[in-house]
Amino acid sequence: MNHLDRIGVILAGGKSTRFGRPKAMVQYQERYFYEASLDALQHHTDQVLIISHPTLTNQFRRNEGIRVIEDDPRYQGCGPLAGIFTAIEKESAYWYLTAPCDTPFLKKEIYDILFSYLDQEPDKKAVIPVVNGRKQPLIGLYHRSCLAPIQSLLEQQRYKVGFLFQLVDTLFVEDKAFEQLHSSFVNINRPEDLSEWT
């Protein structure tokens, strides 16, 4: 699959209410949280898009070469599903690789694994890792054909990403390698969460 067929999407449209300040701009080991997602995605695509909360847009734009847009105004505040919708609607590609902005340990190998499974079942429309029995929908692959089903869910005010998997042919990936990469799926919601890993 050609890199031009892919766009990386960092989902940074949330309010970070529980953390108390914007999580994307928190630093861990001298880099911002979102930069871990950026690094992981840039191994798989030359194009990375940040879906930003309005209060962070200007800060993200200081990172030259990264396109930054805000959630579609119709769906601002409607969660990650709105961010995925905005990315697919605004930028043309076949596949959208999503990553949260608050996973400072995210590794590129996660996407290597997801693409290896997609290569075996290329007709799937979403590819989602499952770790310890839990789906991880914010670290996944979404085909451009997900646009209409996502918009339908948003219009119905059904904002959980999991609802999408009832509408599109989804491949759920359970792989033993995820056990060694389990920290990739750790999202930091509160300052004390980070202290557990430092």
From Swiss-Prot:
UniProt binding sites for Mg(2+): D102
Gene Ontology BP, a term: Mo-molybdopterin cofactor biosynthetic process
GO molecular function per UniProt: GTP binding; metal ion binding; molybdenum cofactor guanylyltransferase activity
Keywords noted in UniProt: Cytoplasm, GTP-binding, Magnesium, Metal-binding, Molybdenum cofactor biosynthesis, Nucleotide-binding, Transferase
Enzyme class: transferase
Residues that, per the record, bind GTP: L11, A12, G13, K23, D71, D102
InterPro entries: MobA-like_NTP_Trfase, Molybde_CF_guanTrfase, Nucleotide-diphossugar_trans
Catalyzed reaction equations: Mo-molybdopterin + GTP + H(+) = Mo-molybdopterin guanine dinucleotide + diphosphate
Cited Pfam families: NTP_transf_3
Cofactor(s) listed in the protein's UniProt record: Mg(2+)
Subcellular location: Cytoplasm
The EC number(s) this enzyme carries: 2.7.7.77
GO cellular component terms, semicolon-separated: cytoplasm
CDD domains: MobA (cd02503)
SUPFAM superfamilies per the UniProt record, alphabetical: Nucleotide-diphospho-sugar transferases
Family: Belongs to the MobA family.
Entry remark concerning the domains of this protein: The N-terminal domain determines nucleotide recognition and specific binding, while the C-terminal domain determines the specific binding to the target protein.
HAMAP family, alphabetized: MobA (MF_00316)
Entry function: Transfers a GMP moiety from GTP to Mo-molybdopterin (Mo-MPT) cofactor (Moco or molybdenum cofactor) to form Mo-molybdopterin guanine dinucleotide (Mo-MGD) cofactor.
Protein name: Probable molybdenum cofactor guanylyltransferase
Organism, scientific name: Halalkalibacterium halodurans (strain ATCC BAA-125 / DSM 18197 / FERM 7344 / JCM 9153 / C-125)
